[in-house]
Amino acid sequence: KNSKILDIGCGRANIISALQKKYKFRNKPIGIDIIANKNVKKNIVFKKIDALKYLEKKEKYDLILIKQTIHFFTNKRLNRLLNLAKKRLNPKGKLLIFSLKTKNNKIPCFKKMKIKLQKSLKRDEYLFKIIKKNLKYTKDFYFNFKVVISKKKYLWMIKSRYISCLLELKEKEVNKGLDEIKLKYKNNIKFVDTLKCILFSK
């Protein structure tokens, strides 16, 4: 009940919102992001701020989440993020770092998207090494999520560049990719989304 939670790169804050709904913490979980998502959940505290800047505050937490965000950091900034996160954990506090599984990833892609995703996942593997070296004592877990999504919604997600590997693609490339997905899939798209989780305990 008294746990303090911070979600770095929270997006819409779905995870901490679900935790708050279930456990009703006295301190509302805090979600930070450099982009204010218009659909951010209302039962958490959202702050639009850079993670490194926020972690320089002396506030302590029992749980810090970093979900699918590491690829936005340079090596130097990632090490700084990890060092600050460790400092901000209470005794017995946990740091959870989530990222996409890098091998045999099943996310439905068009050709250009696949190339960008593979490049991003290759870099993630390198970043995992930096994380392991910095945190030293960690445990790895994998979570499988069965996804069933309508083709219409998935096309909207691609068009909105909801998946970060799409951010660098030109509009023409995205539009061509939309046509590829339209031809490749019927009404519903089914796949298994696997997340890797690195756990550090203070």
Task: Show where each model-derived region lies.
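Class I SAM-dependent methyltransferase SAM/SAH-binding core
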Residues: 6, 11-54
